[in-house]
Amino acid sequence: MGDLILDPYMEDAILDHSCLAELLADQTALPLFHPYSGGATPQMVDTDTFLRAIGALPPLAPPPAAPLAPAPPDSPRTPHTYGSLLPVYGDLPPLSGAVLQEPLPLPEGSDHPVSPKKTIEVASLLQERADQPVVTSNSATTTRPQLCAPYDDDIEATLRAMETNPVERPSPYFLETTQGGRMTALLRLVAATTVFLAAKYEDQYTLRKIDASMVAARCGYTSETRHKMVSCMETEILAALDYNLGGPTAYTFVEHFTRYYGKGKEEKLMREAAHWFADGSLLTYGFHRYLPSMVAASAIFLARLHVRGHEPWRKDLAELTGFWYSDVSTYGPTADTFVEHFTRYKCTTAGERKSYGCMQRLERDVADQSLMNYVRLPGATIPAVHGGGGRRASISVARCSLNRHDALVWSTELQELTGYSFEDLVSCIFAM
């Protein structure tokens, strides 16, 4: 009997054997040695499973697959879980079961609804969105397109708040009241260390170019510990400033106000000239009484006047800078101080000579305008000009431009970008 069962080629003999029914009815487990049992403990196998494994009986048909249960409403695989947290792209509604599927009526002879695949016409969506306007600011006076709408207003507000922070503002006449005009070696060390700190803050490779010992030696310190003196002064300055070194300057606001400029030749010249005016204002202590944004807007005014040759302030510029004409006429710096300041420096490099040539042309333009019959600005306090004084730049750039109402350079875009109108910048331009 055992030989008949173990021989797979004697299937007919097994099927005809009279003891097959008795064998199948017998549920006694047969011993089967497992490969890893070591022959010690037999593995017990069901008789029916054993016969089907050796091919004596046909294999069983696989059981029908059970239908999958529907996912609960709070399953993480369904849109119901996320609700309003799902992203909404453009004008499309948020994803939901009703949007994704639209069940049809039950067909005849069927127990389950048929859900067709939802199709979206992409061409119609693109055509609808093509006529939508460019995203702009929430401000009612803002008309310019914004490069990065979610952050543009935040950057503007942060810069404006930082420049008006009393901690960030310099103390006027501080050296006169504390030093009385006396310069000491310690004060020179403070000045040199601040320049050293600023250079390291702006350029990480400064330590390879500037040595602290050389900085101390230029201040009159020749001892062996002069390097440590610079390090100690750095620590004291940083502690006094509470490590706040990133305040906005006129250079920062020139970059901010000209961020919409393209790569054209004229815009490039205006940007370079504005930076040149703003950088020069840092060398004059009197400009510290003006906000950096006002100095930057005045620099843009002078740059546009030099490049375009007519009135460089319009409504869009006032909205851009935040300064209007009335504000500048009362509180801003002028051009005569600025012209005299820049023309007294010696030019060594090609870039400086080019900038100096631009300044000379601006000076000649201003001198030519001195023969005009000046019109007093409305609401502005402008001293009368008597005599020649062309080289002194006794004519203000604002006066020269205000007598030419037919052309405007200070546009609404620049006014909106900087927040200054032409009226806001007049007095600041006068000081320049």
Curated annotation (Swiss-Prot):
It comes from Oryza sativa subsp. japonica. The keyword Cell cycle applies. PANTHER family: CYCLINS (PTHR10177). This is Putative cyclin-F1-4. It comes from the Eukaryota. Pfam families: Cyclin_C (PF02984), Cyclin_N (PF00134). GO terms for molecular function: cyclin-dependent protein serine/threonine kinase regulator activity. Keywords: Cell cycle, Cell division, Cyclin. Belongs to the cyclin family. Cyclin F subfamily. Disulfide bonds: none annotated. One of its GO terms (biological process) is cell division. One of its GO terms (cellular component) is cyclin-dependent protein kinase holoenzyme complex.
